[in-house]
């Protein structure tokens, strides 16, 4: 009985370690209860752009609780394109102050480097505080701007997202 119990514990720990491998270890320092909630691919015009994972602090996604998005890119994308697309989407979702958007562009330029195929960017949203970003497990930016963080994560998680099917899959909702 002891051997079976040990094997079961080892299997559970192995799963936890492999799951956590998609998040930088430091992310758990900020939000120790993060767990993988759902994952889904993003395809544009049939091209596989990235695989997204949503990590949540509780049983489900709650916007006011810490959560992380992990994006494993399937193709190379230049940093300027990542930043420009993010700013364009934040503007589309209601961020209208161009002075603020210019400041946010500078912050995101620190956070979002160019990526190659199979590289990962992780963003951790700490509601009310800001966000932390990693590329390939290396810290790229700590952003102490709660509004920037809220608008950035809205790109994927807001009801008005440009990719509602991805949002539905990440949130584990039933499509309407």
Which role does the model predict for each range below?
Residues 14-20:
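N-terminal signal peptide c-region/cleavage motif recognized by signal peptidases
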């Amino acid at each position: 009985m002891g051997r079976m119990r040990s094997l079961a514990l080892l299997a559970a720990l192995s799963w936890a370690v492999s799951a956590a491998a998609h998040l930088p270890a430091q992310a758990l320092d900020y939000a120790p209860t993060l767990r993988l909630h759902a994952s889904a691919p993003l395809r544009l015009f049939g091209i596989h752009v990235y695989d997204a994972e949503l990590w949540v602090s509780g049983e489900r996604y709650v916007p006011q609780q810490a959560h992380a998005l992990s994006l494993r890119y399937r193709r190379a994308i230049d940093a300027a394109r990542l930043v420009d697309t993010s700013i364009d989407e934040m503007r589309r979702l209601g961020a209208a102050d161009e002075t603020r958007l210019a400041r946010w562009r500078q912050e995101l330029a620190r956070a979002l480097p160019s990526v190659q195929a199979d590289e990962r960017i992780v963003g951790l949203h700490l509601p009310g505080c800001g966000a932390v970003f990693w590329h390939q497990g290396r810290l790229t930016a700590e952003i102490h701007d709660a509004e920037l963080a809220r608008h950035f994560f809205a790109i994927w998680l807001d009801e008005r997202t440009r990719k509602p099917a991805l949002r539905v899959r990440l949130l584990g909702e039933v499509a309407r």
